[in-house]
Amino acid sequence: MALIRLDKLRHSYVPKPAADADWALKNIDLEWSDGGAYALLGPSGCGKTTLLNLISGLLRPTWGRVRFGDRDVTALDPGDRNIAQVFQFPVVYDTMSVYDNLAFPLRNRGLPEAQVKPRVEEIAAMLELSPTLHSRAAGLSADGKQKISLGRGLVRSDVAAILFDEPL
């Protein structure tokens, strides 16, 4: 986990925001400490998902800075931020086995199978997915698929934070 700071963060989906109503997020100054667990609460449409997408890099803020510790990551691509995001609806490769779904982020980063296998088995055990490791993900329940989404974030040792956007 990393210290996450949001400095005067503002975001608009309007190309040239002029009115107050043009802003999805207005002047957010927040700091989340290393190792903490935090929740964003609010009604639908208030900007929770937008804020998470700004932190993960899926969106770039219209104004302000996103910092991890003292490092400004505002302009970094999502892959360079070492953030895992678990979305409301599970993102799972149905044609792959549970094992291959969990191994995907590690293989994508070029880790040798000798390092992939023990890490996948460790995370599968933690999430109680071991009995299904060699089954196709398509056969799992919604909560089993969400465990895979979570597992793909946990399997990487370089992840600084895991962001949950209304997980089941």
Regions found by a protein language model. Give the residues of each.
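ABC ATPase NBD coupling module
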Residues: 60, 72-87, 108, 113-114
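Conserved ABC transporter NBD signature motif
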Residues: 64-72
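Conserved ABC ATPase "signature" region
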Residues: 72, 107, 114-132, 163
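Short coil-to-helix segment of the ABC ATPase nucleotide-binding domain corresponding to the Q-loop/switch region
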Residues: 96-105, 136
